[in-house]
């Protein structure tokens, strides 16, 4: 007796390689070009860890968000990759910077912490951040940690003028 064919899933690294291969064909803004106000989406917002966790792809009628480098992206259009039961669902609902840098879905790596990453991992992080997430998915906000220290004081390393889609007069 022959049963149903087993479901095949792309291995995480193979799928990431596929995404990177397709990335050059994705539409992107020209260097130095700021989107006109009419081209911008809704204003971005700050997300606490608890708020971001609500957007982990478990609810069918809710957007799916993930953060990389403190930037929160709406990855709902990639539901087949990030939705419930999908290969990269573990990255959603949190800042998964370390996991993206290491190309790892290990729960210990699904954190914002970049301490101890190698130069090669940091380079991979920047490439995926720019060529995949910034090029393909809308920015909906930032993690509060990116702008505020744990004690609530301002993060002096945060420079609004260096942030994609961050127009401080429109946001606060």
UniProtKB/Swiss-Prot annotation:
One of its GO terms (cellular component) is endomembrane system. It is found in: Secreted, Extracellular space; Mitochondrion; Endoplasmic reticulum. Residues 158-172 have a biased composition (Basic and acidic residues). Residues 1-31 form the signal peptide. GO terms for molecular function: growth factor activity; metal ion binding. Residues 151-172 are annotated as: Disordered. Ubiquitously expressed with high expression in heart. Over-expressed in various tumors including carcinomas of the uterine cervix, lymphoma, colon, lung, skin and leukemia, as well as carcinoma of the breast. The cytochrome b5 heme-binding domain was proven to bind heme, although it lacks the conserved iron-binding His residue at position 82. Acts as a neurotrophic factor in postnatal mature neurons enhancing neuronal survival. Promotes cell proliferation and neurogenesis in undifferentiated neural progenitor cells at the embryonic stage and inhibits differentiation of astrocytes. Its neurotrophic activity is exerted via MAPK1/ERK2, MAPK3/ERK1 and AKT1/AKT pathways. Neurotrophic activity is enhanced by binding to heme. Also acts as an anorexigenic neurotrophic factor that contributes to energy balance. Belongs to the cytochrome b5 family. MAPR subfamily. Non-classical progesterone receptors involved in extranuclear signaling are classified in 2 groups: the class II progestin and adipoQ receptor (PAQR) family (also called mPRs) (PAQR5, PAQR6, PAQR7, PAQR8 and PAQR9) and the b5-like heme/steroid-binding protein family (also called MAPRs) (PGRMC1, PGRMC2, NENF and CYB5D2). This is Neudesin. It comes from Homo sapiens (Human). The gene is NENF.
């Amino acid at each position: 007796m022959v049963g149903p064919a087993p479901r095949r899933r792309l291995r995480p690294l193979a799928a990431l390689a596929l995404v990177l291969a397709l990335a050059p064909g994705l539409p992107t803004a020209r260097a130095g070009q700021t989107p006109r106000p009419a081209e911008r989406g809704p204003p971005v917002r700050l997300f606490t860890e608890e708020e971001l966790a609500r957007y982990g792809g478990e609810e069918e009628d809710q957007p799916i968000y993930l953060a990389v480098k403190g930037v929160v992206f709406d990855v709902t259009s990639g539901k087949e990759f990030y939705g419930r039961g999908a290969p990269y669902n573990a990255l959603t609902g949190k800042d998964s910077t370390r996991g993206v840098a290491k190309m790892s879905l290990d729960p210990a790596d699904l954190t914002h912490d970049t301490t101890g990453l190698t130069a090669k991992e940091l380079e991979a992080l920047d490439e995926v951040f720019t060529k995949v997430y910034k090029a393909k998915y809308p920015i909906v906000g930032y993690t509060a940690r990116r702008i505020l220290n744990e004690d609530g004081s301002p993060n002096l390393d945060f420079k609004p003028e260096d942030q994609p889609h961050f127009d401080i007069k429109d946001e606060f």
